[in-house]
Design a protein with these regions (language model features):
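Membrane-embedded alpha-helices and immediately adjacent juxtamembrane helical segments
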Residues: 1-291
């Protein structure tokens, strides 16, 4: 197992050597910033349709009350919920297009990590790939809203109840993120790569992302003034902190995708890499012949 892990890590390192993963993650983050609010509007409005507006308001309010105080996002969540429930359906349909931009950004980044040519239609392919996520988003939003009373109650009690609340919310977030990651990984599979291992890898990557999400909640509890580097502009500081978190999240996502591809590529162990390398033509320095 340890030897296999070493083979996967070395293969991923070779594929990423000399390539700008940070730039790719920044590109994905740009598209995410365009899409995250429209996506949240669709998810919350759909959850209200499946449940009720009061169900959504109550769930969001309970989560807002349970989050750390120093940078509590309660007002922002309340405004987002009001917009989601009050926007006419005709106007809400307009948000579907920018919501799919996330899929375009993800596919562009994943294609680069896989070392594949993007192609002229990569943007539309990514948006179409993300449509199932949009369709599922109301259902995925119901899970944290339905468990808000339980989890928020555990969060605020301290001690072991808080631990169990974090454990419960981690698994809820993991299943939600895993569903999205599996769709994205399967939809972006390079030619010749089986989708089954990519979906399995998506669940492992989702566990890391869910843990990172909970780390961000811990970051919210640190009483730092985010506005200091921006001349005291509170909104700018908060938005910049969120964008930085999204950027780091996408770095982890792209790394996880590369490791998943390398795990599939090296499934036969180091011998699989040697066999693949033996197929690569080599030129004899003496004769100049290709062997």
């Amino acid at each position: 197992m340890i030897r296999r892990a070493g083979v996967v890590l070395r293969d991923a390192g070779r594929e990423l050597r000399g390539r700008d993963l940070s730039l790719w993650a920044a590109g994905v983050t740009f598209f995410a910033v365009l899409a995250v609010v429209p996506l949240a509007l669709v998810a919350l409005r759909g959850a209200a349709f499946l449940g009720s507006p009061e169900f959504v308001r109550h769930g969001v309010s309970r989560w807002a009350d349970a989050l750390p105080d120093p940078h509590g996002p309660g007002p922002a969540l309340s405004a987002l919920t009001t917009a989601a429930l009050g926007t006419p359906w005709t106007a809400l349909l307009v948000t579907l297009l920018p919501a799919t931009f996330y899929g375009e950004g993800l596919l562009r980044g994943l294609v680069q990590v896989a070392g594949q040519p993007a192609g002229a239609l990569v943007g539309w392919r990514g948006r179409l790939m993300f449509v199932p996520v949009l369709v599922l988003s109301p259902t995925l939003a119901i899970a944290p809203l339905a468990t808000a009373d339980t989890v928020a109650g555990l969060y605020t009690r301290g001690g072991w109840p808080t631990f169990w609340g974090i454990t419960l919310s981690f698994h809820i977030d993991w299943l939600i993120i895993a569903s999205v990651t599996a769709i994205v990984f399967a939809g972006s599979a390079p030619r010749g790569v089986r989708r089954g291992p990519l979906v399995a890898g998506a669940f492992a990557v989702a566990a890391v992302l869910a843990g990172f999400f909970h780390g961000f909640l811990l970051f919210l509890a640190i009483p730092l003034d985010w506005s200091v580097p921006f001349g005291g502009l509170v909104v700018v500081g908060a938005v910049s902190a969120l964008i930085l978190w999204l950027y780091l999240l996408h770095v982890l996502l792209l790394l996880g995708y590369r490791l998943t591809l390398s795990a599939e590529r090296t499934q036969l162990g180091a011998g699989g890499i040697d066999a693949e390398a033996s197929k690569t033509p080599t030129r004899s320095p003496a004769s100049g012949q290709v062997h």
